[in-house]
């Protein structure tokens, strides 16, 4: 006798159980008291608010945006970028700043290392005239300034460069050789406890750049660790491990690095994905190079021999020539980029965009027609009113 098996029910379509009326009344009373004491929205049912997608800031690399799973770095969260020296940590952070500014956002840069190069930042697209920069004297001052700027609610992104340079005041005022065990870790733990809630309320992304150190006496496993204690590892929603894997050369001249970023931690999407992209000297992340790589991966751009084709048209021979072609034709670059994002499900398809545009155009036409009709009604009503007053 065969056993009957019922198909598994989708959790989203499960029947909602009705709450006992007495318990429901008690819960509603408690929620009303919470709102009265702490303000509207302090506690609510998750279903009371419409589900909203997480706002993101693009990183400048399409490959990294796809690896993050949501199209960029999440707003209102803490992000840690760490890696060896000269691996591109600051460059990546500056690209995020530039992209936030391009969207009309406000950015701040806490330069604890006192090493920010405004000329290089401008080459990466940063609007240095509107960038808020602070070069604090000690770690407490740096984190206090960061906290005050975040609580203003006006920032979109703030970069702290770097955690290793957040030296506690006691260490600066003390003598060389004095022991200050755990002082920086306690400072970071206290600051992150204060910042986390403020970042979420303000919708500000905080990027902490960190350095690597080696643990002494570790014979098995990875001896590398980051500075500033363990608090940042817990509070960060995204942790990025950035490494230089290859030197890019034009003949004998080095023109940049091939960079790999591993998403070590990700609370927004599945972690442990990697992205590779070109980082060119004096130019930063090659957006066009990343678009070529990802478009080729999903089949939007095809490669035959050394020739690259897009929708049957040849883009050029050799990756460097295609990169230059896309740089000279930003409209084509954006079109290819949108198709790649659609393949990954981050945005609607091109057909959906066309439908949305048609709907928006139709709505605009109907609004204009309604406005014209209202004007005509007013125009005909005015003489009638005048004549009625004259008769009276």
Swiss-Prot record:
**InterPro entries per UniProt:** AAA+_ATPase (IPR003593), DNA_recomb/repair_RecA (IPR013765), DNA_recomb/repair_RecA_CS (IPR020584), P-loop_NTPase (IPR027417), RecA-like_C (IPR049261), RecA-like_N (IPR049428), RecA_ATP-bd (IPR020588), RecA_C_sf (IPR023400)
Classify the source by domain of life.
Answer: Bacteria
Does the record bear Lipid biosynthesis in its keywords?
no
The record's Gene Ontology cellular component field reads: cytosol
Sorted UniProt keywords: ATP-binding, Cytoplasm, DNA damage, DNA recombination, DNA repair, DNA-binding, Nucleotide-binding, SOS response
Key word Nucleotide-binding present: yes
**HAMAP family from the entry?**
RecA
Residue spans of biased composition, Low complexity class: 379-392
> Hey, which family's this protein in?
Belongs to the RecA family.
- List the protein's name: Protein RecA
Which residues lie within the region annotated Disordered? 1-21, 372-392
Residues annotated as binding ATP are 83-90
Q: Where in the cell is it found?
A: Cytoplasm
- State the protein's purpose: Can catalyze the hydrolysis of ATP in the presence of single-stranded DNA, the ATP-dependent uptake of single-stranded DNA by duplex DNA, and the ATP-dependent hybridization of homologous single-stranded DNAs. It interacts with LexA causing its activation and leading to its autocatalytic cleavage.
Report a single Gene Ontology molecular function.
ATP hydrolysis activity
Where, if anywhere, are coiled coils annotated? none
Q: Which SUPFAM superfamilies match?
A: P-loop containing nucleoside triphosphate hydrolases, RecA protein, C-terminal domain
* Swiss-Prot/TrEMBL GO biological process terms: DNA recombination; DNA repair; SOS response
Pfam families recorded:
RecA, RecA_C
Name where it mostly resides.
Answer: cytoplasm
